[in-house]
């Protein structure tokens, strides 16, 4: 349930990458948005939130409970999602500035995503926040500048309800 999932999101993501609880819950009414809770042997273990946008899948959040990390479970879930959706995939990642962010990028790379170096700014997730510098990773391949601009524009308008130019 949402009330099981949201605490995992709060523990796995910085406040700059997560909406307020009721704003996150309101997304459940969005036609392109899907929130999945994954159970392992009956126990809630992981979650991912996706947006099915035109010809690509945008993964907004992906988190595995701490006790299920580092055993290949997250990778198995990601691979299953990719196999099921059969469409290009996009995920935002933090800049590779420290060991943790480099490890996250490496996780996605091991599952076939490519780090794109185009400067990307995530619109604010909460009132009063500024933009967040991130990068896009894509599968099955790196994207050209035209595709990057199209993905960025669609993510900003559909996911963040932001119509400006960042």
Report residues per predicted region.
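A short helix-loop-beta-strand connector motif used in the catalytic cores of GNAT acetyltransferases and
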Residues: 27-37, 130
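Intrinsically disordered, low-complexity, charge-dense segments enriched in Lys/Arg
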Residues: 112, 126-129, 133-139, 143, ...
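Conserved beta-strand in the GNAT
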Residues: 37, 42-52, 56-63
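Conserved catalytic-core motifs of GNAT/GCN5-like acyltransferases
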Residues: 92, 105, 109-129
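Short amphipathic alpha-helix that is part of the acyltransferase structural core
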Residues: 1-23, 39, 134-136, 146-166
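Conserved GNAT acetyl-CoA-binding A-motif
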Residues: 85-100
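Conserved acetyl-CoA-binding loop-helix of GNAT-fold acetyltransferases
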Residues: 64, 70-83
């Amino acid at each position: 349930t949402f009330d099981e999932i949201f605490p995992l999101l709060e523990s796995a993501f910085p406040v700059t990458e997560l909406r307020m609880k009721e704003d996150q819950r309101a997304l459940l009414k969005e036609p392109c948005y899907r929130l999945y809770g994954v159970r392992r042997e009956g126990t809630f273990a992981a979650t991912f939130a996706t947006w099915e946008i035109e010809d690509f899948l945008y993964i907004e959040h992906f988190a595995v409970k701490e006790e299920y990390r580092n055993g290949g479970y997250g990778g198995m879930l990601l691979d299953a999602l990719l196999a099921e959706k059969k469409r290009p995939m996009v995920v935002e990642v933090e800049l590779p500035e420290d060991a943790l962010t480099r490890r996250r990028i490496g996780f996605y790379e091991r599952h076939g995503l490519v780090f794109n170096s185009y400067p990307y700014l995530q619109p604010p997730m909460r009132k009063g926040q500024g933009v967040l510098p991130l990068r896009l990773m894509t599968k099955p391949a790196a994207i050209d500048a035209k595709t990057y601009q199209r993905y960025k524009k669609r993510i900003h308008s559909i996911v963040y309800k932001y119509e400006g130019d960042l």
